[in-house]
Amino acid sequence: AAMRVPQDAKPDFIFVTTKSYDTANAMIALRAFADRAIFVTLQNGLGNAETIARTARRVVAGTTAHGVTFAGPGEVRHAGVGETMIGAWSRVGESDLVRLRDLLADVGIVASVTSDIRTELWSKLVVNASINPIAALAEVPNGRIVRDKRLLGVLEAVCREATAVAKAEGARVDEDELRHRTILVAKRTAANRASMLQDLDRHHRTEIDAITGSIVTAAERHQIPVPLNASLYALVRAREAAFRVASA
């Protein structure tokens, strides 16, 4: 990983790994490579690939369900194995995707290539929105959500709302399959403290806008009621606002 990149570097791939709200600023620093490298995003939420593609010519979008826990500055702990998917977003060919897949395999990350990355992004968004805000507000690791019947009921209802929005947006998703996938991800990352929970623990800004906010915005566009997602969005934003007031 690099925070500063020599302007004469010639990377084949650049992975943008910032929080979603920092993507635009990251691309300002990386614009010298816009025509030289293939940019890769596995970030949470929607909108990252679009933001990157406004600067970079070639973009790969993807999703991953690997769980990671922040241990300290410059130190993270791998807390769960999950599926990784990659697909072409802008001016990327099959050979580029295969090369990236093989590169990831070399470092122990098994990735699959998909021809429908937009559906995968929406699927990951539904999973994320069904786990992250609940874990953050209940202050529990992912596994507790599926062991607690009350929290599991909330997860299933949030997932149901979000899936309806994903379908309206054109994603080829199935409600039962996504519910099963969400529960499986929570079990596989049972010990992981969701990124949104880690952010709130440190009184940092969360990615609620790119995750649940994307669902609420799309739901309004399609006039689909999503009361639970809207409530979770409002509650997490309220927690963020409380931190800002306390630090003022």
Model-derived regions, located:
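Internal alpha-helical scaffold of NAD(P)-dependent oxidoreductase catalytic cores
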Residues: 32-33, 51-58, 62, 74-175
